[in-house]
Amino acid sequence: QIIKVLSAAESETKLRLLFPTQDGRAGLGAGNFNASPTSSEQRELMVSTVVGWSDEEHIAHASSLALQGTWTKWSEQARPFDFSWKNLIYGPGPHLIRFVLNSLINCVKTPDMLQLWGYTPTAFCSLCGNDKCTLHHILVNCNCALVGGRYTWRHDSVLSTMEPVLKAHLSSLKNEKDGGPPLIEKSFVRKGDNLARPAKLAPRKSLLSGSTDWKLLVDYSDRPIVFPPEILATSQRPDIVIWSIALKKVVMIELTCPAEEGIEAARERKLGRYTQLKQDIEEVGWTAGLLTVEVGARGYVAYSTERCFRQLGMQKRKVSSLCKSLSRVVARCSYAIYLSRKNKDWDKNRELLADADVPRQPVQDQTTT
């Protein structure tokens, strides 16, 4: 079996060397194609080929599973939780990591899974009495958790993470005339050639371009906002409102934390809720923009969230850092909600959030000679 795999990998490696493909946006002929690689380079190509086959078989097998393979469908519309070695070692604690991993393959100890495994005779929800208490029910669909403010607390936690980043971004726009930091135009240079011309700086165009008097309002459950009356008198309250009187422009951002399989439906629902408000604002002479932010209950960040922050003019590095922070916050809050699935006294269990996010420090060698 090993000989067959190696021979197949060697054949595919030869095909990759004879018929190389161009990756990225560099253009044809910009890559470094080595027709006669060394033995170490051939070994790396063969290893990458075998690893690619293994990954394809793993994903194909996971997709065929009814319960454990649902996570393969989320990768098309959401960015997964950060499982890098750095985050696993120095990031959240082992309990949170175990919860996120088990939630992806539907192996969390929920009442329905305990009944399936034969540990309990029923699968009732301890809070609302639902006859089938799944992980989806605990995280996003329990009426008692909704009325008790657990989902609202998670929602406010995400808003409190976004607010300082947006404030810092708006303050940075005051020093930029074009509404954001400049973009560097990348010039691709072949090996051995010199840069023909210096890289040009192109202004970043975003929804916040052209003004520096932007104001920000964030709607919390305990601190509700009033929609700016100079724009329009309405009782609707988007989660985040950014507006400029000089440009007569407003940007509304709506946040939701649905289940990963319902991210697209949640986005369409939020857009439909505020479409009429957007039209009313445009009728009074203002320019309105409507964006959505979706973070799955297991920590998967929708790609539309990244596009939202990019449309605001944020740099890619800051967008990536913010998305990781949002993913971790939602995962911590969902873990706290899961731990309190049997406790109706929610106010006394909010300290679970701190226990779920204690960063682990490197273990010091305490051996004595």
Residue ranges and their predicted role:
Residues 116-169, 250:
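Short Cys/His-based metal-binding microdomains
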Residues 111, 135-139, 169-177, 281-289:
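Short, flexible/disordered secondary-structure transition segments
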Residues 145, 158-159, 163-198:
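UBC/E2-like fold recognition across ubiquitin and ubiquitin-like conjugation systems
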Residues 42, 46-51, 58-67, 150, ...:
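Non-catalytic C-terminal interaction segments of nucleic acid-processing enzymes
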Residues 1-113, 120, 124, 330:
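Extended C-terminal regions of large enzymes
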Residues 117-118, 141-144, 176-186, 289-295:
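Short amphipathic alpha-helical segments embedded in low-complexity Lys/Glu-rich regions
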Residues 89-91, 113-118, 147-152, 261-266:
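Conserved, non-catalytic sequence blocks in retroelement Pol enzymes and Pol-derived host proteins
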Residues 1-2, 11, 42, 46, ...:
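Alpha-helical interaction elements in eukaryotic regulators
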